[in-house]
Regions:
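N-terminal, non-cleaved signal-anchor transmembrane helix
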Residues: 1-102, 106, 277-415, 422, ...
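Transmembrane-helix bundle segments that line or gate the permeation/cavity pathway
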Residues: 3-5, 158-162, 166-171, 176-178, ...
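Transmembrane-helix boundary motif in ABC transporter permease subunits
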Residues: 103-137, 412-446
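Generic hydrophobic transmembrane alpha-helix motif, especially the helices
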Residues: 137-171, 446-479
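Glycine-rich helix-loop "coupling/hinge" segments at transmembrane-helix boundaries
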Residues: 154, 228-260, 265, 285, ...
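Short helix-to-coil transition segments within interhelical loops
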Residues: 185-213, 239-241, 495-496, 502-512, ...
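Transmembrane alpha-helices
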Residues: 201-235, 257, 261, 510-545, ...
Length: 594
């Protein structure tokens, strides 16, 4: 029996209706568009149109790539065979780079925790403190790390301290924001229980809020460690020791065999770090998700426990004794307040000790010392005076023109990344391809692309296509595949399976299920990721100008070289205004489509 036979149509109304020949009104199947929705759609179309326009204005076409084919062959012949440094020198460079990256990540965590507590709604003492802390976080994220490196170089001079401060302060922009989000997502029940016992605000935060957010905090720190490792290549071009500085020296002397060998080492280092930290992050966040799901799924009764598997049933078991028996000589029973030394606790303590040892060794290798900090504190205010007030140095028109080129590079690179990341992300989603092996293969491809620093891609494209904006747009386009492809795959996998199963039940084919059920539900998240990628590409486009990839980054580096620090401040303010504009657009669009 069909659906129509099971539910016969209702009788028509008895009141006066339309005369013979009149058409029956159609029921709307889509919601009426709102003014906010139309405005957001118009803004997105303008962004896409801007990408197409930038693609054309920069003359990114097949002819440009074809003309560069001979340069690519010549460049490849000049890089082979690869010339790796001696083993001892290579290990020293790797350890120097890792020490700076680890120290910078720890510094960002130390700075981000109090900022996040001030920025989170449930822990902030007031609206003023929340607004100020949020502003500091946004400012740290908007200013490129190379600008912090230029300022830190004036304060601390040559050495690892410059890299630690530059990477650490810039990382606060991302780490602080994610930490604040993690604090806001904690369960208020534990904090309320502590408050009922008379605990103060600090005791509530240390006893209830931070323990819940700890897995997310560690996962975010590991993720930032990967990003800082890739960013360390950029700081080498402003004098920070490590693999990046050796790479910069090789590029300056046109020693492409040594340069590409160092680039391969940096790529493998980033890939290994991304793989290891990714596995740890998945384990930590999976435990948090399972715990939260178990708290929401079924209650806990006295004497019962939740099964460790999601969806398991509560099983009654006697609680272990918590009170030790009376001592032999007679006395008061002692309540045990610390957990027993199980294998899990021993393993966790071992990892904690190794982590602390790594942090201490990294701080020593980076050259961190109280005397360096004291000298930096003494020269901070004089150095700040070198950058203020902002000035144009007589090249204000050129700065505006190069800022426009930087925006074109970011738009074109984002469009290229979108075209490449959408199919790759779809193939990496298990619910789209249906084959775990195929999804795992494309996940690995995306991971390999993400492990390549954008600066290395820019160097390759500068040599192949020549100096200018074309190389920067191509580098950003290929580099965007790593982040945007992963975000697209994650968004597709997180869609609800119900609509897709309903279409499959009607006999729909794979592409019909994808375009009819999976992609529409993931599209709002994909749009948010796309705008975030545009934000990232705009800041990256500023950095790529350092190696001749066009844009305002070239003016930034030249101003720093000739000690025109007011011009550096002007460039930072111009880029900051553009970044804040795009970030505001992204926040508004996500709110409309939420």
């Amino acid at each position: 029996m069909s659906v129509a036979e099971q539910h016969p149509p209702a009788a028509p109304p008895t009141g006066p209706g339309p005369g013979p020949g009149a058409t029956r009104p159609h029921r709307r199947t889509l919601a009426r568009p709102t003014a906010a929705g139309l405005s957001a759609a118009t803004a997105l179309l303008l962004c896409v149109g801007g990408g197409v326009w930038a693609f054309s204005a920069l003359r990114l076409n097949i002819a440009t790539l074809t003309d560069s084919a001979d340069n690519a062959v010549n460049f490849l012949s000049r890089t082979l065979p690869l010339d790796f440094p001696p083993t001892g020198e290579l290990l020293s460079l790797i350890w120097q780079t890792l020490a700076i990256v680890v120290s910078a990540t720890v510094l960002s965590v130390v700075l981000s925790v109090p900022l996040a507590l001030l920025a989170a709604r449930n822990t902030s003492p007031g609206a003023g403190a929340r607004a100020v802390s949020r502003g500091v976080i946004v400012l740290c994220r908007a200013v490129p790390e190379v600008v912090f490196a230029i300022a830190a170089f004036r304060v601390f001079g040559l050495g690892g301290m410059t890299g630690v401060v530059a990477l650490g302060v810039h990382s606060v922009g991302m780490v602080g924001k994610l930490y604040a989000d993690a604090v806001e997502q904690t369960d208020e029940g534990q904090r309320t229980a502590l408050r009922a016992t008379g605990a103060g605000r600090l005791q509530q935060i240390t006893g209830a809020v931070l323990p819940q957010a700890l897995p997310s905090l560690v996962a975010t720190a590991l993720h930032r460690l990967d990003i800082n490792l890739r960013a360390s290549a950029v700081l080498g071009f402003v004098g920070v020791n490590g693999l990046g500085y050796a790479l910069s020296t090789a590029i300056t002397t046109l020693d492409y065999r040594r340069a590409m060998a160092l680039a391969v080492v940096l790529l493998l280092l980033c890939f290994v770090a991304e793989s290891v930290s990714g596995a740890i992050r998945r384990t930590l966040l999976q435990d948090v998700t399972t715990a939260r799901r178990s708290r929401r799924s079924w209650p806990v009764f006295p004497g019962a426990r939740r099964d460790e598997r999601p969806g398991g049933t509560a099983q009654a078991r006697p609680s272990p004794p918590t009170v030790a028996g009376p001592p032999a000589g007679g006395g008061t029973a002692v309540r045990r307040t610390l957990p027993r030394w199980s294998a899990r606790r021993i393993r966790g303590t071992t990892w904690l000790v190794l982590t602390v040892a790594l942090v201490v060794a990294s701080a020593v290798r980076s050259g961190l010392s109280w005397s360096t900090l004291r000298r930096g504190a003494e020269s901070f205010l004089p150095t700040l005076g070198d950058f203020l007030p902002p000035g144009t140095g007589g090249i204000g028109g050129q700065l505006l023109a190069d800022l426009w080129v930087t925006l074109q590079i970011a738009l074109a690179g984002t469009l290229i990344g979108l075209v490449l990341a959408l199919p790759l992300g779809a193939l990496a989603a298990r619910n789209v391809v249906g084959s775990p092996r195929a999804a795992r293969f494309f996940r690995t491809v995306i991971l390999l692309v993400r492990a390549v620093p954008e600066l290395v891609l820019a160097i390759v494209f500068v040599v192949v296509t020549g100096l200018g904006a074309v190389s920067g747009a191509l580098a950003l386009g290929v580099g965007s595949v790593g982040l945007l492809g992963k975000l697209v795959a994650d968004s597709l996998e997180e869609t609800e399976p119900g609509p897709a199963r309903a279409l499959v039940a009607t006999g729909a084919r794979g592409h019909q299920v994808f375009f009819g059920a999976v992609l529409p539900r993931a599209w709002p998240a994909v749009v948010g990721h796309l705008l975030y990628q545009l934000d990232v590409n705009l800041r990256s486009a500023t950095l790529l100008g350092i190696v001749g990839a066009g844009g305002i980054g070239y003016d930034l580096l030249n101003a720093a070289r000739v000690l025109q620090f007011p011009v550096v401040t002007t460039v930072v303010l111009m880029v900051l205004a553009l970044v804040l504009l795009i970030e505001g657009l992204a926040v508004w669009v996500r709110k409309v489509y939420a």
